[in-house]
């Protein structure tokens, strides 16, 4: 049985609890940490209800005290994004496997340090890009690997959502360069991971334009990224947190010489278009995975199962630290592109952080 702890008991934590409970044959929650004690009580109560047991868990406001009290196999980090690197390194340096909610880190150096530390200590590191496990996404990846879409030309990701002023007021760290970033880093990173996974190619350049139109935050509330791959493929990402009056769409589109696929739904969980040579589109459109109760989707259970299996089989998780690094690198390159007004050559892109994005330096057009 693997002992899990949760660091940070915010709005995503109920999904984390679900993921652990749904893998209860091999995983159990033994501890939590948060600076607000009542949030830890809420997580304990929720976990007890879901496993139908009054089994208590260790609660510490200082996450470092958990290792002094209990044996820990896996730490799940779901704090403000700006703390992911520090906390992740602490657990990895103390022999604990780590799952980090997106993003992996807020700098290229920090993300690389996490990946390197996990490798050095022979530990597993995963990032919660849980939408990779959605059934329609798995079908698309399989079709691409089998070359059923032929040569891939381009991909498009659109995340057209709304995050009103209350969203940012509820947690003042949101939208800050130090702890969060803007809509590209926060809302769009899952689809950025997906499109890069589907393209499965080395990136040549990243170019972006972003703006802050109406939200009272440091970072962008709208952005567009253009990625050119070394093979010639092109991917575009459009992200918005200011769609009126409510979320409009989250879609992933892949086009190739023999196929076009569009996946949408609340959390890229529904096939909207499946026009692939030799396939019956109606059969694919009839696949009903149902809408989840939030944009977090269904993937945490499968992501945690894959992580547990990776530990058992001594292999890399599907969404390992390197995958998390690649997603962060794309977004940070987009931020640097906005700051400089130039496309960023990825092979020459070494060091950058959201902290380099002081608002006064950003050219919002």
Model-derived features: where do they sit?
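Rossmann-fold dehydrogenase core element
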Residues: 2, 113-130, 150-157
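Hydrophobic residues in well-ordered beta-strands that form the structural core
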Residues: 100, 125-127, 237, 263
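Beta-loop-alpha module in the N-terminal Rossmann-like domain of NAD(P)-dependent dehydrogenases
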Residues: 16, 56-117
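C-terminal capping/lid region of NAD(P)-dependent oxidoreductase domains
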Residues: 123, 150-154, 337-365
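Contiguous beta-strand/loop segments that form the cofactor/metal-binding neighborhood of enzyme cores
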Residues: 186, 192-270, 297, 301-314, ...
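Glycine- and charged-residue-rich phosphate/anionic-cofactor binding loop of Rossmann-like
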Residues: 27-31, 310-327
């Amino acid at each position: 049985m693997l002992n899990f702890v949760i660091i940070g008991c915010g709005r995503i934590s109920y999904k984390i609890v679900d993921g652990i409970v749904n893998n209860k044959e091999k995983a159990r929650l033994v501890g939590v940490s948060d600076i607000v004690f009542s949030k830890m009580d809420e997580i304990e109560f929720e976990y007890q209800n879901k496993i139908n047991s009054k089994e208590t868990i260790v609660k510490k406001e200082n996450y470092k005290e958990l290792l002094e009290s209990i044996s820990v196999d896996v730490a799940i980090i779901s704090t403000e994004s700006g703390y992911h690197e520090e906390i992740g390194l602490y657990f990895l340096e103390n022999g604990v496997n780590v799952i980090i909610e997106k993003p992996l880190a807020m700098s290229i150096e920090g993300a690389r340090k996490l990946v390197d530390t996990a490798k050095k200590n022979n530990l597993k590191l995963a990032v919660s890009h849980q939408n990779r496990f959605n059934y329609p996404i798995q079908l698309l990846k399989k079709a691409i690997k089998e070359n059923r879409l032929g040569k891939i030309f381009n991909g498009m990701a659109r995340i057209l959502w709304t995050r009103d002023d209350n969203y940012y007021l509820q947690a003042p760290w949101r939208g800050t360069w130090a702890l969060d970033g803007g809509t590209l880093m926060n809302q769009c990173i899952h689809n950025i991971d997906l499109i890069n996974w589907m393209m499965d190619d080395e990136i040549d350049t990243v170019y972006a334009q972003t703006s802050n139109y109406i939200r009272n935050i440091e970072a962008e509330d709208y952005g567009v990224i253009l990625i050119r791959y070394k093979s010639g493929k092109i991917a575009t990402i459009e992200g918005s947190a200011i769609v009126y009056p409510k979320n409009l769409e989250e879609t992933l589109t892949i086009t190739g010489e023999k196929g076009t696929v569009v996946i949408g739904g609340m959390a890229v969980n529904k096939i909207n278009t499946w026009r692939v040579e030799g396939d019956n589109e109606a059969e694919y459109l009839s696949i009903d995975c149902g809408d989840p109760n939030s944009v977090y989707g269904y993937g945490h259970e499968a992501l945690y199962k894959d992580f547990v299996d990776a530990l058992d089989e001594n292999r890399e998780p599907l969404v390992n630290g390197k995958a998390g690094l690649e997603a962060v690198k794309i977004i940070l390159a987009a931020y640097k592109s906005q700051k400089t007004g130039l496309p960023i050559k990825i092979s020459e892109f070494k060091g950058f952080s959201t902290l380099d994005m002081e608002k006064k330096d950003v050219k919002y057009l």
